[in-house]
Regions:
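Nucleotide-activated donor-dependent transferases that construct or modify glycoconjugates
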Residues: 10-21, 184
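A short, glycine/small-residue-rich beta-strand->loop->alpha-helix junction that serves as a flexible
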Residues: 16-27, 54, 189-198
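Short amphipathic alpha-helix
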Residues: 24-36, 50-53, 203
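Conserved nucleotide-sugar phosphate-binding/catalytic loop shared by glycosyltransferases and other
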Residues: 44-74, 234-238
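Conserved nucleotide-diphosphate donor binding/catalytic pocket of glycan-assembly enzymes
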Residues: 65-162, 181-186, 190, 284-287, ...
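Nucleotide-sugar donor-binding patch of glycosyltransferase catalytic domains
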Residues: 120-121, 239, 268-322
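Active-site donor-nucleotide binding/catalytic segment of nucleotide-sugar enzymes
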Residues: 161-227
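Donor-binding and catalytic core of enzymes assembling or modifying cell-surface/extracellular glycoconjugates
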Residues: 199-278, 282-285
């Protein structure tokens, strides 16, 4: 009888989170809080192909739904996606993407819904701020405000733990004979070269001069970064000639002695798995706005990354390892 009662009273809850990798990492605490506030409900997550299999590992999600994110004018795709979502009869939606696209989904699925049914930064906007002002607040504080305004108790949103994404990498570590290592992420998207610090090889020289072979110096290039990795004087870690998947990448980061990264997805992973490290920020944004600084993971913020010396970065590393 109790089981029947629970089944009858179980609701379906939808979370929307499309990407990018840094965004996915940051949302881990919010997803955990949503789940813990809905212990008797089933949590579904709508995401994109790069994160579909990854989210199947998340212990706080019951089922993952794929959104191919085809153009909005593809009415046939849109029709079938909306039909798919409607069949779950979701009682509440948490929009953690907060994009124009997900706002468009709301206009189809729940056009008149308030924050009790559709939780987003728009429906939970503070009375004294417009959206532009609200978006200047750090991303984790925005999530926290959104969930609090939606009636949730939040104990994880401000301190996400991405550890759930990790996997066994003993075979990779054995293949490359690595134990203690310093992990570098000198890469960035081709259209975001403003995020790229140019002095990694000089930093590597400083590390080798101080520590010799105490630490291996490695990189973990993504699919489009394998060629670029050849320009860095570090061991590039691959899995049978291919880039590591997100779970393998997470474990490599989590097991490292120290991480040095440009402002990229792997830097956000490092921040939210508790590893020691530093990320390098130019004037493109602030470390505060993207919520990347943690107890062990810090940012160096400068106006021009070209003028940030390898010595300054090495100083952060050596003081942390000593």
């Amino acid at each position: 009888l109790i089981l029947c009662y629970l089944v009858i009273n179980m609701s379906n809850i939808l979370i929307i989170k499309h990407g990018s990798l840094g965004d996915i990492t940051q949302a881990s605490g919010a997803i955990q809080d949503i789940s813990e506030n809905h212990k008797n409900d089933q949590i579904y997550l709508l995401t994109t192909k790069p994160y579909f299999d990854l989210f199947k590992k998340n212990p706080f999600i019951y089922e993952v739904i794929l959104d191919k994110r085809l153009p909005r004018y593809n009415l046939i795709y849109l029709y079938f996606l909306m039909r798919e979502l409607k069949k779950y009869n979701f009682s509440k939606v948490f929009d953690l993407q907060n994009s124009s696209r997900t706002n468009f989904y709301k206009s189809i699925l729940f056009p008149k819904a308030d924050k009790k049914v559709w939780s987003s930064s728009n429906t939970t906007l503070p009375l004294d701020k417009n959206k532009e002002e609200f978006d200047k607040i750090s991303v984790l504080e925005r999530f926290d405000h959104q969930l609090n305004e939606s009636g949730l108790n939040t104990s994880n949103t401000l301190k996400p733990d991405f550890g759930w994404a990790s996997t066994d990498i003993s075979e990779i570590k054995n293949f490359y004979k690595i134990d203690k290592y310093i992990l570098l992420f000198p890469f960035c998207s081709p259209h975001l070269t403003i995020k790229k610090w140019p002095h990694y090889n000089k930093l590597i020289d400083l590390i080798l001069n101080r520590y010799g072979d105490e630490y291996k110096i490695i990189t973990v290039p993504g699919p489009s970064e394998i060629n670029d990795a050849k320009d860095i004087n570090a061991l590039a870690i691959l899995d049978n000639g291919r880039s590591l998947d997100i779970s393998q990448l997470t474990s490599m980061i989590k097991n490292s002695s120290f991480v040095i990264a440009n402002d990229t997805g792997p830097a956000h992973i490092a921040a939210h798995v508790g590893v020691k490290g530093v990320t390098l920020f130019g004037k493109h944004t602030t470390a505060y706005k993207v919520s990347i600084e943690r107890d062990n993971f810090k940012a160096i913020q400068v106006n021009d990354l070209n003028n940030l010396s390898a010595e300054k970065v090495f100083e952060k590393l050596s003081s942390s390892l000593s």
